[in-house]
Amino acid sequence: LGSGKAWDLSRKRDGLFFLPPFGKQDQDISNSRIEALESIRHFLVTSKEDYVLLSDCDIICNIPYHDVVEAHIRNQADITAVYQHGIIPQHMSEPTVYSVEENGALRDMLIHPKVDGPCNYGLNMYVINRPLLIELIEDCVSRNMYNFNRDFIQRNMFQYRFYCYEFKGYSKVICST
């Protein structure tokens, strides 16, 4: 990315941030995404942005995130998950499968299901309203619930406006095992 100037990201405030998986001095490594997010809570609280994009680092794709954010805003969603239709990649860890309404609203979500054919599988990319993200992180931590898919997403999927965005481009899961 270099300085990020070509993408208007070379600012002292806002722009693009790559955050470490742990943000506390007394913490060597995070065991879950929720712990990692909780460790950067101060950054999330002081940020002025309305939305947060969460993405794992083991999927390669050329996705227009601005389209995902626009769909999130257009749907007045609280959470938008990115998915792809096809066969679940072999090395995807804890795959999620979405049942999606025609308008993109989430109908159901399964974690690590037995699926033999094509389905709507999650790419572990989410756009979330920042204040809601902070609230849900605090709730999960206070209840000692640290599984992102089960405790953060699945447990809350019918309490909030949850939509899905279909990515129709090429993607590949990176696996070093």
Kindly give the residue locations of the regions a language model identified:
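Unchanged
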Residues: 1-177
